[in-house]
Amino acid sequence: MKTYDIVVIGGGPGGYVAAIRASKEGKKVALIEQGHLGGTCLNRGCIPSKALLKHAEMIHAIRDASKYGIEVGDMRLSLPKMMQRKNQVINQLRGGIAHLLRTGNIDFYHGKAEIQPDQIVEITGDKPERIKAGSIIIATGSSPAVPPIEGLEQVAYHTSDTIFDIEKIPASLAIIGGGVIGVEFASIFESLGTKVTIIEMADRILATEDEMASQVLTKHVGKRGITILTKAKVAAVKALGSQKQLMIYNEAGAKQDVVAEEILVAIGRRPNLSASANLSLDMDGPFIKVNVRMETSVPNLYAIGDVVGNWQLAHVASAEGIVAALNATGHATDMEYHIVPRCIYTYPEIASVGLSEREAKEKGFQIKTSMYQLAVNGKALASGQAEGFVKLIADETYGEIVGAVMVGPHVTEMISQISAYMQLEGTVEEMANLIFPHPTVSEGLLEAASDWLGKGIHS
């Protein structure tokens, strides 16, 4: 039986990062993955969706070309070619991870892992094997959650795991869930010419995000023909010829039917726990309970990523993976969650970090906010993408930035600048004293900071 210092179960953005970091600390490491390297993010999530969102961006640019004095003829879409490009991106990144594992001298096992007593890991698959670990890191991720809707299992429906495998563009699509996954797919399919309906139980889409950001996106997607039903619950689904009929009730009990060719269920995700089924772990609801060092209730057993809840984000899983690897290799390190950037790749983009206004007030902060509208930003106007804003949330006494929300072009790239400021306990005054390049959307940060101080030039 082979023995390793550390065995990582799961090859997603948390698992493979943990394995590589542990290897760089001089440990003998094994990584087990039952699917493809890269996990959900690379194969069925972050990366393929961004590849298709790029297609959506290009489609809209072509459709809007006449606004810029460019006349084009009829546009033809090839879904097979789009999927081919998406798969090329995935395969290239998969190969990159495999190369990193090889150069890091990490043993890779393809199969399903189950943790047995005494740090034994049993691997089933093409080549069954048992290995022993000094420490184990569980990074098995999550799967799409499917609600118990009457009739849903009797019709064909999609989740984020299967929607990337469609073979033709649907004429209509009903999306159950108006969170991040739902609105991103709505943007993709609307660009392809699909009639999209979003059905959301809350009173707005992106209910956990900034309310004004949600309002801006709601207004924009409405202009593009996407129908949004809020305070709505799908009670039943049934086949209607080649289509599906969704029976929906609003909070007042009024019934409304939506007919669509395809259904996408996007209500959230549930943790994959089969690897630890033989263990008596302390749980936090459906998730594995861990401390700030990513340690579970079982000695020498760590858990990271979607199985522990917290933030179900790839970059958080990677950060947790590094923390777990460091602790497993004898370097005491705590995980920090107060500066987690969050990005939504819709049109316009949404990005945020730190505390919202509500959260800051609940934590007892005396805060002051400022906002700069991109409608007066030169670069945004020149680019034809002037819908959006930059909002800064800062401590009223010292001006320390505790949170930010941005809506507009390139904000998913800009948010890291705010994260860096917060990490260094930066203030709005320090930001207002920076020289920003002109013309850029990032000048919105300067304007918002200056406005917070009551010294804004363009606000």
Locations of regions flagged by a protein language model:
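FAD-binding beta-loop-beta segment adjacent to the flavin cofactor pocket
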Residues: 144, 286-300, 379-391, 395
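Flexible, glycine-rich terminal cap/loop adjacent to redox cofactors
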Residues: 9-14, 23-35, 40, 47, ...
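Gly/Ala-rich phosphate-binding loop of Rossmann-like dinucleotide-binding domains
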Residues: 19, 23, 186, 190-191
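Short hydrophobic core segments
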Residues: 7-9, 113, 131-141, 176, ...
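N-terminal Rossmann-fold NAD(P) dinucleotide-binding loop
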Residues: 15, 182-183
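FAD-site-proximal beta/loop scaffold in flavoenzymes
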Residues: 153-170, 257-328
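Beta1/beta-strand and adjacent pyrophosphate-binding region of the FAD-binding site
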Residues: 1-12, 169-179
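Glycine-rich flavin
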Residues: 2-4, 20-27, 32-169, 197, ...
